[in-house]
Amino acid sequence: MKVNNYPKLHNAAWPGVVGKGSPGAEPFIDLDTMLDHTAKAEVNGVKFDGFDLFLYDPHISIDATEDDLKRLADKASKRNLTIGSVVAPVWPPTGGGAALDEGEGRKNFLAQVEKGCEIAMTLREMGVRPYGIVRIDTACGPSDFLKDPIGNQRKIAETLWMACEIAEDFGEKLAAEGEICWGGMQSWITMVDLLERVDRPETLGFQADMAHTLLYLLGYNAPEHRLLPEGFDWKDEAAFDEAYMKLTDTLRPWTTDFHVAQNDGTVHGSGSHDKTGRHCQAKDPNGKLDIVKRAGYWLREGEGGMPHMRYRHICWDGCMFPNSVMNNPQTWNDILSTMIDVRNAHGWHE
């Protein structure tokens, strides 16, 4: 029997940047170090196939030149890694703007999307990026969004529709990562509503992160949309199955990019990053997710269905871990082992 070799297994480079580098936070971990950790991880002869990337300093500038991108491509190639999905820095502190702001915010948001799509296209043309999307969100918080939820959702949808036009010009696709900290995306209901309003399923999809979507079940920033009751008993597997199936059946048709992750049912913020679903280590005993089982709800056509094979790669996401954890080789071997288990259970062979 052939061993599954798809989806390809990627690590994320941005945990070296997210929640780090600001006053009171730990220092950044440079890109070379993150790529070395990724390339050196190995479990029974299996290694990571590639990495996903945040298009922002200190890893790679959103204003990178072609020579900068050639150097990036060389960094990947010499480690036998491909590049997959990339994150456009659409937020105000990184040169972007709020998608609900019809003025400068929208202009800056779209400018960063354009730069991100151009980089993604260039890396694709260089032959180091065979698949992947450009990751975005709404770059505004729930509190601002809730000042006028109906009007703001309309404005956000208009901004994202324009972003789709830009992406198509570069032959790229966008995916919005559902997190409780983004206005218009703070619950599974608002997320689907936004995707339906934009109505560009060939260009704008959903990026499902297992840690962040778990918080959708709990309704952390939208109690009216919670799928698990307050004080939920995590030992009640049947109730969790029912809620998780409802969530994934709703969002899976829109999902074009997938993050394997663990969460302990709490939120966490670090440095400049707002509170969002807490990423936990792959083998954290407090993790609420049976990662392999729950990944199947995203990677198959419903519970027990056939693998749908729509994601050419899947990526581990574990942000805001202490640097001591990040620089421990066992961390990455544990992560890779979990990713292999997911692929063996729900992948395919080509």
Which residues make up each language-model segment?
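Short, flexible/disordered intra-domain loops and linkers
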Residues: 15-29, 59-64, 145-151, 219-236, ...
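Aromatic-rich peripheral "rim/lid" segments of glycoside hydrolase catalytic domains that contact
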Residues: 274-276, 280-291, 315-350
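Acidic/histidine-rich catalytic cores of soluble enzymes
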Residues: 151, 157-277
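A short, acidic, amphipathic alpha-helical segment used as a generic capping/interface helix at domain edges
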Residues: 36, 241-247, 285-308
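Active-site groove signature of glycoside hydrolases
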Residues: 119-149, 170-181, 315-316
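N-terminal pre-domain/capping segments
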Residues: 1-130, 151, 161, 168, ...
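Acidic-and-aromatic substrate-binding clefts and catalytic sites of carbohydrate-active enzymes
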Residues: 25-30, 53-68, 92-98, 141-146, ...
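Hydrophobic faces of well-ordered beta-strands that scaffold small-molecule active sites
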Residues: 5-12, 49-53, 83-88, 132-136, ...
